Amino acid sequence: MSSNNQESLANRSHTVTVSETSQILQLRANQTEQVPKLAKKEQKSKVRWDENVVDNEHMNKKKTKICCIFHPQQNFDDEDGGECEHASSSASSSSSSESENDTSMDFEARRQARIARRRQKLERKRSSSPNAYEYQPDYSQYRQKYLHGDK
């Protein structure tokens, strides 16, 4: 019967439950040691805005960096073609042109003046040289060298 007993033991399954306790290591500073605090001179100063700092579009976002370049409108009512572009733009450095600020003109007259200025601006010939974003380098000479094997 010992062989039967061994077979019955082999067919049995045993469940063993092992319980582990997790150990947590907590590090604490020694109570006698004190962490040195920063002196008042070393503390980081906070930004304080003057009253003359402009609020960015009334959103309480005050910035010190310039985020865009302002190009004042040019006054096209003066037909002086001899003036250079930067001189005329600095001469009309107000936020809008004179015709828009002119209260003697009604809405339709100001509108027509704006349309005329816009047409003049579009009709002016742009310089033929491309700007930095439009410039495309010419690699044709390199392409021909590598295609023909003239390395």
UniProtKB/Swiss-Prot annotation:
Keywords: Nucleus
MF GO annotations: protein phosphatase 1 binding; protein phosphatase activator activity; protein serine/threonine phosphatase inhibitor activity
InterPro entries assigned to the protein according to its UniProt record, in alphabetical order: PPI_Ypi1
Feature: compositional bias, Polar residues: 1-34
GO biological process terms on file: glycogen metabolic process; intracellular monoatomic ion homeostasis; mitotic spindle assembly checkpoint signaling; regulation of protein localization to nucleus
The keyword DNA damage belongs to this UniProt entry's keyword annotation: no
Biased composition (Basic and acidic residues): 39-56
Gene Ontology cellular-component annotations: nucleus; protein phosphatase type 1 complex
Composition-biased stretches (Basic residues): 112-124
First-listed, main subcellular location of the protein, grouped into a coarse class: nucleus
Composition bias type Low complexity, residue spans: 87-98
Region (Disordered), start-end ranges: 1-56, 78-151
Keyword Zinc in annotation: no
Top-level taxon: Eukaryota
Localisation per UniProt entry: Nucleus
Matches recorded under PANTHER family: E3 UBIQUITIN-PROTEIN LIGASE PPP1R11, E3 UBIQUITIN-PROTEIN LIGASE PPP1R11-RELATED
Family affiliation: Belongs to the YPI1 family.
General function of this protein: Regulator of type 1 phosphatases which maintains protein phosphatase activity under strict control.
The name this protein goes by in its record: Type 1 phosphatases regulator YPI1
Native source species: Eremothecium gossypii (strain ATCC 10895 / CBS 109.51 / FGSC 9923 / NRRL Y-1056) (Yeast)
UniProt lineage: Eukaryota, Fungi, Dikarya, Ascomycota, Saccharomycotina
